[in-house]
Amino acid sequence: MLDKTLRMNYLFDFYQSLLTEKQRKYMSLYYLDDFSLGEIAEEFDVSRQAVYDNIKRTEAMLEEYEEKLSLLAKFEKRSEILQQLKEAVDKQATSEELMALLESLDTLE
């Protein structure tokens, strides 16, 4: 499983358009720009607790979106199959093996 920061970055990439502008700003500053809660609080003139609560709520929302839409899971599976395809081509796999991998990629959606 991905570490939390990397997972949140992926989820943010996939689902940021579903967030409010404020949620996007807080998440971007916290996860992408590595701001501390205190720095974000100072930037927006709110308490650290308000920033913390907003980020935790947004993380939960991103996890809910992933649970329902599975964009990250599909991305990871697609990446895994593409890696298997590359390895199969390198080892000169049979056309049946290659077709099986292509079909699994095709049925992923």
From Swiss-Prot:
It comes from the Bacteria. Belongs to the UPF0122 family. Might take part in the signal recognition particle (SRP) pathway. This is inferred from the conservation of its genetic proximity to ftsY/ffh. May be a regulatory protein. This is UPF0122 protein BH2485. It comes from Halalkalibacterium halodurans (strain ATCC BAA-125 / DSM 18197 / FERM 7344 / JCM 9153 / C-125).
